[in-house]
Amino acid sequence: MKFSKIFVFVFAIVFATASVSAAPGNFFKDLEKMGQRVRDAVISAAPAVDTLAKAKALGQG
C-alpha cells in the first residue's frame, strides 16, 4: 500500500515536470517580436496614410 502511494506521487511529479514549459525568458522574446511587428507595420503603413491625407486635402481644397 505504501509503495503504491510512493509510486503515484513519483508519477505525479514526473508528469508535472514533463508538462511544464521551462522557458520563462521565451515570453519576453515573444513580446519583443510582437513589438517589432507592430513597429514594422506602422512604418510600412506610413506611405499609405500620407497618400490618404493628401487625397483628403486635395478633395477638400
From Swiss-Prot:
Keyword Secreted attached: yes
Specify the superkingdom.
Eukaryota
InterPro entries in the record, alphabetically? Cecropin
PTM Glutamine amide: list the residues: Q60
Q: Transmembrane helix as a keyword?
A: no
The stretch of residues making up the signal peptide is 1-22
**Any Pfam family:** Cecropin
Which GO terms of type biological process are on file? antibacterial humoral response; defense response to Gram-positive bacterium; innate immune response
Triggers of expression: By bacterial infection.
Those residues forming the propeptide, per the database entry, are: 23-24
One of the record's GO cellular component terms: extracellular region
- Tissue range of expression? Mainly in fat body. Lower in hemocytes. Not expressed in midguts, malpighian tubules and silk glands.
* Keywords, sorted A to Z: Amidation, Antibiotic, Antimicrobial, Immunity, Innate immunity, Secreted, Signal
Give its localization: Secreted
The protein's job, in short, is:
Cecropins have lytic and antibacterial activity against several Gram-positive and Gram-negative bacteria.
Name the family. Answer: Belongs to the cecropin family.
Q: What is this protein called?
A: Cecropin-D
Give the organism, scientific name: Bombyx mori (Silk moth)
